[in-house]
Amino acid sequence: MAGGHVAHLVYKGPSVVKELVIGFSLGLVAGGFWKMHHWNSQRRTKEFYDMLEKGQISVVADEE
């Protein structure tokens, strides 16, 4: 009677290449989101100063 063999998972340790790829990918995604935030902030600031220059808005409170 031959007993069946059960496959056991063997922990080989961390995969350096896999860790580097995951870290690089997460860094690129986080950097992309940061750049999008920065571009949006720049656009809003530019729009504000353009409107201020055209006289559409004012930073001085109106006296009533």
UniProtKB/Swiss-Prot annotation:
Keywords: Membrane, Mitochondrion, Mitochondrion inner membrane, Transmembrane, Transmembrane helix. The chain crosses the membrane at residues 16-34. It is found in: Mitochondrion inner membrane. The keyword Oxidoreductase does not apply. GO terms for cellular component: mitochondrial inner membrane. This protein is one of the nuclear-coded polypeptide chains of cytochrome c oxidase, the terminal oxidase in mitochondrial electron transport. Sweet potato cytochrome C oxidase consists of at least seven different polypeptides species, subunits I, II, III, IV, Va, Vb, and Vc in order of MW. Belongs to the cytochrome c oxidase subunit 5C family. This precursor was imported into isolated sweet potato tuberous root mitochondria without any significant processing, the import being dependent on membrane potential. This is Cytochrome c oxidase subunit 5C. It comes from Ipomoea batatas. The gene is COX5C.
